[in-house]
Curated annotation (Swiss-Prot):
Keywords: NADP, Oxidoreductase
Pfam families: FAD_binding_3
Catalytic activity: resorcinol + NADPH + O2 + H(+) = benzene-1,2,4-triol + NADP(+) + H2O
Top EC class, one word: oxidoreductase
Name of the featured protein: NADPH-dependent resorcinol 4-hydroxylase
Organism: Corynebacterium glutamicum (strain ATCC 13032 / DSM 20300 / JCM 1318 / BCRC 11384 / CCUG 27702 / LMG 3730 / NBRC 12168 / NCIMB 10025 / NRRL B-2784 / 534)
Function: Involved in resorcinol degradation. Catalyzes the NADPH-dependent conversion of resorcinol into hydroxyquinol through hydroxylation.
Domain of life: Bacteria
Pathway this chain belongs to: Aromatic compound metabolism
GO molecular function: 3-(3-hydroxyphenyl)propionate hydroxylase activity; FAD binding; pentachlorophenol monooxygenase activity
């Protein structure tokens, strides 16, 4: 099919972080991408304020170093949940370095991150951002998806004579939020878990030093459940739960905001109130994430309460999971059927974080004092029985898809350590590279694989190296890879571009079998050696 038949390879509806990151990742691979944003200007208020170690690793794809970035910071306190008396009910580990090579938790100012994503996109010859373009129709044929749109700066009041325009793409991605036009057009239903709580969100810029207690914590006081967390460098976020019968419009007023902050010694003389808005926390997810040549991502596919700090993270995981699949398909290396595995994998993974977020929400969203007292007694006993060990949130697993179910660690998040490669000592991603990787413990996989396996690996641009002691191409400086593979009883490991484990293998024969299976799962075309 001639590329001249298309206006773009991928049309992304929605210019938030999920859509823009996807555009940048595809643009880096030379694919033509058009972002459609219905508003004439971008939203300049934060929604998310935090991301985890996995997202820090993903941001490395676009050159953002979360450890050394003036727009990102981190804190050393655990994420504590306390009752009205100040007793600890729950500790979540937000303090340590992880096996991803990054800290458990980072804090940022979302408008700044989004601007940097857009600025990067605008430097790319293959990425176009269209503001003031409202999608009003979506149609598909065998080879394309077409967005029917209206060019207007007033999407809520479209003029009768507004210019109409169609954009024909090979694929359409709906990254257009909770009220997704793309999802609704495709008839993809959302499963609603019946979780609804209204909270007042306050974003502040302190002008004086203020004592917050610990850096990030939850006050589980039935009289007013409250969240106190960073909002990125130089900013703070406060969240107050709306009580039963409370007028939400009045709650969101500036006067109400300062009244709620006053007991915390936060006053207009000590901080600038940048935003006051009531949000309804919900838990919903789409059962199907694809219909023909259209797919959904981010809030269009899933919503969760913010208590685990994973909402935006889930959307950025979607971006990378889609990007490497679309790259293989658009490059002609893989059949279109590969895209079916995207939703299958991501749906189960995001379920974990939705459930975990709801569990945390069920701890704090209690306004009945008797119920709160019973909760306190139970959770204090549970914490004492655990000797105060913080809750580990990093156990989510991919759903069925592109990973070997018979391998130890298949479908799990891969580890990353400090290595030395060709004279450079750094994290593996920065020293060796990102993408598919086949690593052998003190063994060069290229020396033991047959020609068909090597052709398939070369087709997907895989890194193929030995890792381990000084005899290996990649020196395992910290010993992480050596310990990891020995613990798995493996000599080889295959990892994916989104940093998940495809498989582990004990010997060359098993590795070759796994690579053949990988070729089949990726639907690699015969011209690339599958």
């Amino acid at each position: 099919m001639s590329p001249n038949n298309f206006d773009t390879d991928v049309c992304i509806v929605g210019g938030g972080p999920t859509g823009t990151l996807l555009a940048v990742l595809l643009g880096q691979k030379g694919h033509r991408v058009t972002i459609l944003e219905k508003w004439p200007t971008f939203y300049e208020r934060p929604r998310a304020v935090t991301f985890d170690h996995e997202i820090a690793r993903i941001l490395g794809y676009i050159g953002i170093d979360s450890e050394n970035d003036e727009a990102i910071d981190y804190h050393s306190d655990s994420y504590d949940w306390k009752n009205a008396a100040g007793e600890t009910l729950l500790e979540v580990d937000w303090t340590s370095m992880t096996d991803s090579g990054w800290r458990t938790r980072y804090w940022f100012y979302q408008p700044e991150l989004e601007k940097r994503l857009r600025d990067l996109a605008l430097t790319m010859d293959f990425v176009d951002i269209r503001c003031g373009f409202t999608a009003v129709g979506l149609s598909q044929d065998e080879n394309s998806a077409i967005i029917h749109g209206i060019v207007t700066d007033t999407p809520e009041n479209i003029p009768a004579d507004a210019q109409r325009e169609d954009i024909r793409a090979k694929y359409v991605i709906g990254a257009d939020g909770a009220n997704s036009f793309v999802r609704n057009s495709l008839g993809l239903e959302m499963n609603d878990l019946g979780y609804f709580f209204d909270w007042l969100i306050l974003d502040l810029k302190p002008t004086q030093d203020i004592d917050y207690g610990t850096d990030h914590w939850q006050l589980c006081d039935p009289k007013r459940p409250t969240t106190i967390v960073p909002g990125g460098p130089g900013r703070r976020r406060w969240e107050f739960m709306a009580l039963p019968g409370e007028d939400l419009k009045e709650l969101a007023s500036e006067e109400s905001a300062w009244n709620l902050l006053e007991p915390w010694d936060v006053t207009p003389g000590k901080a600038i109130l940048e935003r006051s808005a009531v949000y309804r926390f919900q838990a919903r997810w789409a059962q199907e994430w694809r219909s023909g040549r259209a797919l959904i991502a981010g809030d269009a596919a899933h919503l969760m309460p913010p208590f685990a700090g994973e909402g935006m993270c889930a959307g950025l995981r979607d971006s990378l999971a889609l990007a490497w699949r679309l790259d293989l398909v658009l490059s002609g290396k893989s059949d279109d059927a590969l895209l079916d595995t995207y939703g299958e994998e991501r749906r189960e993974h995001v379920h974990y974080y939705i459930d975990f977020s709801m569990d945390l929400g069920n701890v704090i969203c209690i306004t009945d004092e008797d119920e709160a007292r019973l909760r306190d007694e139970r959770m204090i006993k549970e914490l004492e029985a655990q000797d105060g060990v913080p809750v580990n949130t990093d156990v989510a697993h991919l759903g069925p898809g592109i990973w070997d179910k018979d391998s130890s660690h298949g479908g799990e998040l891969a580890k990353q350590g400090i290595v030395e490669y060709q004279g450079r000592k750094a994290r593996f991603d920065d020293a060796v590279g990102r993408g598919w990787a086949v690593l052998g413990l003190n063994t060069d996989p290229r020396e033991v694989l047959d020609e068909d396996s090597l052709v398939a690996l070369d087709a997907i641009g895989a890194i193929v190296e030995s890792v381990g002691d000084a005899t290996s191409a990649v020196l395992d400086v910290e010993g992480l890879y050596t310990r990891w593979l020995k613990e798995a009883g493996a000599t080889f490991i295959i990892t994916r571009p989104d940093f998940y484990v495809y498989s582990t293998a004990v010997d060359a024969e098993q590795l070759q079998t796994q690579i053949k299976q990988l070729s089949d799962l990726l639907h690699l075309n015969s011209v690339v050696g599958a």
